[in-house]
A protein has these predicted regions:
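Active-site bordering "gate/hinge" segments
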Residues: 1-152
Length: 152
C-alpha cells in the first residue's frame, strides 16, 4: 500500500507499520515475534528521526540553522538503515499485512547500523544540539519567558 507511507513524509515507516497493524487487528492476523521486533525497531527509529527533525526545524525557526543541519544529518542515517532494509530510503513500503516485504538482508549489518546510530551517533547529535541551543543567545532570547504560566 504505497500511498500510506506518503501520508507522513517526516517518518513514513511509522505510518506504513501503523496501517498494516490496524488491518491485522481488524482481521485478527498475528505476526511472528521476529516481525514484531523488526517493526518495533523501525518505528522507534522513525520516532527518533521525527524528533530530530522537529527540534532542528524549531531551532531553524528560532535562528539556529546549524542545529537544523545537525538534526537532519542524523535523520539521513536512519534513511540509510531504511534503504538497507527495504531498498528505499524515503518511502520504504516495507510492511505487508501479516508480515514484512522480506526479511532483513543481513541481520548482523542491521544490528551494527542500529547500534552505531543508538550508541554513537544519536548521543553525539543530541549533545551537540543541546550545546548549540542552550548557548545560542538568539535562541534563548526568543524563547525565554515565552508561555510562562503562573500559579494563578
Amino acid at each position: 500500500v504505497c500511498t500510506i507511507s506518503r501520508m507522513d513524509y517526516i517518518s513514513p515507516i511509522v505510518n506504513d507499520i501503523a496501517w498494516h497493524t490496524a488491518v491485522e487487528s481488524l482481521f485478527d492476523i498475528d505476526c511472528t515475534p521476529r516481525c514484531k521486533s523488526i517493526r518495533t525497531i523501525l518505528c522507534e527509529l522513525g520516532r527518533i528521526q521525527n524528533h530530530l527533525l522537529c527540534v532542528g526545524a524549531a531551532a531553524l525557526d528560532w535562528g539556529g540553522i546549524t542545529s537544523f543541519i545537525y538534526g537532519f544529518n542524523e535523520r539521513e542515517f536512519v534513511y540509510d538503515i531504511l534503504d538497507f532494509v527495504s531498498g528505499q530510503r524515503f518511502h520504504p513500503d516495507y510492511t505487508r499485512v501479516g508480515g514484512l516485504k522480506n526479511d532483513l538482508p543481513c541481520e548482523e549489518t542491521f544490528k551494527t547500523m542500529v547500534k552505531d546510530f543508538i550508541h554513537k551517533r544519536l548521543p553525539k547529535a543530541v549533545g551537540d544540539l543541546e550545546t548549540m541551543l542552550n548557548r545560542n543567545r538568539i535562541f534563548i532570547d526568543r524563547l525565554q519567558g515565552v508561555g510562562v504560566m503562573t500559579k494563578q
